[in-house]
């Protein structure tokens, strides 16, 4: 019997992030407490999001609105990294980034968790920014998935290519 396997990846659906950003921008333009604060939220490059407002409290509230929209679109908070409010002239800015991919350090940590706490016979191989987990038994793979979901990792994980 052939081995069963799946891949552990950390990817974010850019369209869902864009939808969350547009929803947040619409809410910021219509909410009463943001009137007159010139609060904007927009993409800055491919992976960065810039939130600008006239006061530090309003920029923090705008970040909270954006995070709420991300959660509603089923995007993990681990995938969004918001910086601290920075004064920029008469306004305050927050630069946030969308984190994708598993670094080699995180991949080593994940494979160590699988090796130490997972069932016997399960193999984990690092392949670039993803990890291939294989085993003869599908039940062992299900155990590894639940183990990784319970682990406290600083990266949002998805499980794809389940064969």
Curated annotation (Swiss-Prot):
One of its GO terms (molecular function) is nucleotide binding. GO terms for cellular component: cytosol. Keywords: Nucleotide-binding. Pfam families: DUF520. Nucleotide-binding protein. Belongs to the YajQ family. This is Nucleotide-binding protein Mmcs_0777. It comes from Mycobacterium sp. (strain MCS).
């Amino acid at each position: 019997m052939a081995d069963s396997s799946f891949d552990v990846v950390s990817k974010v659906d850019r369209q869902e992030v864009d939808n969350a950003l547009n929803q947040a921008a619409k809410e910021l333009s219509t909410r009463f407490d943001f009137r007159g604060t010139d609060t904007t939220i927009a993409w800055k490059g491919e992976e960065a999001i810039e939130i600008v407002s006239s006061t530090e409290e309003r920029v923090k509230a705008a970040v909270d609105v954006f995070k709420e929209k991300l959660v509603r679109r089923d995007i993990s908070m681990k995938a969004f990294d918001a910086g601290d409010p920075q004064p920029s002239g008469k306004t305050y800015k927050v630069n946030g980034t969308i984190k994708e991919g598993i670094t080699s350090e995180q991949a080593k940590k994940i494979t160590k968790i699988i090796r130490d706490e997972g069932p016997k016979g399960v193999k984990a191989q690092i392949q670039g920014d993803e990890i291939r987990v294989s085993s003869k038994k599908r039940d062992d793979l299900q155990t590894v998935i639940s183990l990784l979901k319970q682990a406290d990792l600083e990266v949002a994980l998805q499980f794809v290519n389940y064969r």
